[in-house]
From Swiss-Prot:
Gene3D superfamilies tied to this protein: 3.10.20.30, 3.30.54.20, Anticodon-binding domain, Bira Bifunctional Protein, Domain 2, Threonyl-trna Synthetase, Chain A, domain 2
Role: Catalyzes the attachment of threonine to tRNA(Thr) in a two-step reaction: L-threonine is first activated by ATP to form Thr-AMP and then transferred to the acceptor end of tRNA(Thr). Also edits incorrectly charged L-seryl-tRNA(Thr).
InterPro entries recorded: aa-tRNA-synt_IIb (IPR002314), aa-tRNA-synth_II (IPR006195), aa-tRNA-synth_II/BPL/LPL (IPR045864), Anticodon-bd (IPR004154), Anticodon-bd_dom_sf (IPR036621), Beta-grasp_dom_sf (IPR012675), TGS (IPR004095), TGS-like (IPR012676)
Family stated for the protein in its record: Belongs to the class-II aminoacyl-tRNA synthetase family.
Name of the protein: Threonine--tRNA ligase
SMART domains per the UniProt record, alphabetical: tRNA_SAD
EC number annotated for this UniProt entry: 6.1.1.3
GO MF entry, a single one: threonine-tRNA ligase activity
Cofactor(s) recorded in Swiss-Prot or TrEMBL: Zn(2+)
């Protein structure tokens, strides 16, 4: 007897023996269902359920369901490539955000024409509606099969799987691939897909290993979703922060300093405006600011645990007075040193310590991407040292601050990923229970929706990741809050409790922006360079029509500068139409145009970015409107 409980309905069905999803679900429901979750594990609809189970239905409209369809598409692509180019060897084909890829070993260089042919073949395979058939094989069966058909990379993967563990393969028509699954019932479920590009990749990510060709694709639940995504990509290309930054003269990156930013005048103004804004928020919320060294002894990184876990990503200075030093990849161990510089009492807690900390990480050159992925960066980093019973209230305060900052920067759609305890972790379950409960209650009280990432917390504590949605619907994970029970203990941090004894504080690692570099990249793309007036590097440009207006324009400029307005004055002899085009292309939000008439009447002609309309205002009225648009409140 097998008892099946449907988690959403709490409805129980009993069966005389083993059953599958096809047995359990009604035929009409099967059209939208791609898989099941059985006691928390994903199952194909054809996989047998052998014991009592709680069932959750996975539909195509679910995030997990769409991920399964993309996994299907990766297998279909691999089959298409093998049919078109039989000498190609297949390696791995996972899903990624918005799509999938598959790595192929071949002497052939895939072209755009090849992608067209592969896509056509994929459509034929979809039309054939081959069933995805799961089979459990022994290790020997798997090695014999894949070595027999010359798939050496699959044999290599099998060799890394523990001895005695059975393996699963999936068959679709004549094509067989090593795979954990799950898959949808058949290839016909993949309704809307497109191959996007070809890139190089190394086997197992090792630059010393064989070079492979990676084909990227995307797949969606229907053609409307696919077309919407492709339109979003076109819009994203127009908003590429690297292109806009070049047009606006914000920054550049060059080979002599790979992954590090050369901020130009306008870009650094933007950077400083953002930093000043965050600094004010921190001060108003009870933080104090510190500055810690960039070069720190290996000994501290060993004690903190970063040397073992993070050494490959650290820049090492071999010798300095017989000491090995490392450029810091993060600020937290240094902040503990400041905490440890005094004896702390429970009355001092919480301590909110902030730093605009410059860090460096040795990211691979292939992963670098404009401001979005760099080697040298500055974090809006802060650490809150508190007692365990203060975790909830501090998390609520942080969530409120984060929501306020995101909203004022133009992001009102925020979601949260909550990562709870991993299998391997420090601390006892009671401590984890309290920490997880404190975070979840704080998120709910802040009015934020969250998604559970089971087992994805760090070994030293649970984690919140804050995801914002931009103007074209893309999600960006920026803010974080991480509970840490371990680092204060490792580095000897303590406070004197009400009982007169020493206690280790809980440490909350938190950031709102993440890094200034990446967040500025996100801001550029969100606004397409057309920043709100308060944030714009140049808030106003005064353009003269004639030299007779130069003195008036300069006088206005000086008044505005005294008021803190970031203003430029264009007194060149160029035609006014050229000046308007120039400063509009530089995304200056407001233009004041002055000529003989404006000088006489003490007025300005106001033109806003993106509009061809000009309106005449008295200088007093225009100034009042300008200051109002600059003021956040």
């Amino acid at each position: 007897m097998v008892r099946v409980t449907f988690s959403t309905e709490q409805k129980v069905k009993e069966y005389s023996g083993k059953v599958t999803g096809f047995d359990i679900l009604q035929p009409d429901a099967l059209k939208e269902v791609v898989a099941l979750k059985v006691n928390g594990e994903l199952y194909d609809l054809s996989r047998e359920i052998e014991a009592d189970a709680e069932i959750e239905v996975i539909q195509l409209s679910d995030e997990v369901g769409l991920d399964i369809i993309r996994h299907d598409a990766a297998h279909i692509m691999a089959q298409a490539v093998k049919e078109l180019f039989p000498n190609t060897q297949i390696t791995i084909g996972p899903t990624i955000q918005d799509g999938f890829y598959y790595d192929f070993a071949t002497d052939r260089t895939f072209t755009t024409d090849d992608l067209t042919a592969i896509e056509k073949k994929m459509k034929e395979i979809v039309k054939s509606n081959h069933r995805f058939v799961r089979e459990v094989w022994t290790r020997k069966q798997s090695v014999d099969f894949f070595s027999g058909i010359g798939e050496k990379y699959k044999v290599d993967i099998i060799s890394s799987i523990p001895e005695g563990e059975n393996l699963t393969v999936y068959r679709q028509g004549d094509f067989v691939d090593l795979c954990r699954g799950p898959h949808s019932p058949s290839t016909g479920r993949v309704k809307a897909f497109k191959l996007m590009k070809v890139a190089g990749a190394y086997w197992r990510g090792d630059s010393k290993g064989p070079m492979l060709q990676r084909i990227y694709g995307t797949a969606w639940g229907n053609k409307d979703e696919l077309n919407a995504y492709l339109e979003c990509l076109k819009e994203a290309e127009k908003r590429d922060h690297r292109k806009i930054a070049k047009d606006m003269d914000l920054f550049h990156i060059q080979e002599e300093a790979v992954g590090q930013v050369f901020w130009h005048e306008q870009g650094y103004i933007l950077y400083n405006v953002l930093e000043s804004y965050i600094r004010k928020k921190l001060i108003n919320n009870g933080y104090f600011e510190v500055k810690t060294p960039i070069l720190v002894s290996k000994e501290l990184w060993e004690r903190s645990g970063h040397w073992d876990k993070f050494r490959e990503n650290m820049f090492i200075v071999d010798e300095s007075e017989n000491k090995k030093l490392a450029i810091k990849p993060m600020n937290c161990p240094c902040h503990v040193q400041i905490f440890n510089s005094h004896t702390r009492s429970y009355r001092d807690l919480p301590i909110r310590m902030a730093e605009f900390g410059t860090c460096h990480r040795n990211e691979s050159s292939g992963s670098l991407h404009g401001l979005m992925r760099v080697r040298g960066f500055t974090q809006d980093d802060a650490h809150i040292f508190c007692m365990e019973e203060q975790v909830n209230s501090e998390t609520i305060k942080f969530c409120d601050l984060l929501k306020e900052v995101y909203s004022e920067l133009g992001f009102n759609e925020i979601s949260v990923k909550f990562s709870d305890r991993p299998d391997i972790r420090a601390g006892n379950d009671e401590v984890w229970d309290r920490a997880e409960k404190a975070l979840l209650e704080a998120v709910k009280e802040a009015g934020l929706s969250y998604k559970l990432n089971p087992g994805e917390g760090a070994f030293y504590g649970p984690k919140l990741e804050f995801v914002l949605k931009d103007a074209i619907g893309r999600n960006w994970q920026c803010g974080t809050l991480q509970v840490d029970f371990i680092l204060p203990e490792r580095l000897g941090a303590f406070y004197i409790g009400a009982d007169g004894h020493k206690h280790h504080p809980v440490m909350l690692h938190r950031a709102i922006l993440g890094t200034f570099e990446r967040f500025i990249g996100i801001l550029i793309e969100n606004y397409a360079g057309k920043f709100p007036v308060w944030l714009a590097p140049t808030q106003l440009a005064i353009l003269t029509i004639t030299n007779e207006a130069d003195g008036y324009a300069t006088e206005i400029s000086n008044i505005l500068k005294e008021q803190g307005v970031r203003v430029k004055t264009d007194l060149t002899n160029e035609k006014i139409s050229y000046k308007i085009r120039l400063h509009s292309s530089n995304k200056v939000p407001i233009l004041w145009i002055v000529g003989k008439n404006e000088v006489t009447s003490k007025t300005v002609s106001v033109r806003n970015l993106g509009s061809e309309r000009q309106e005449s205002f008295s200088l007093e009225k225009a100034n009042e409107s300008l200051l109002k648009s600059i003021n956040l409140n």
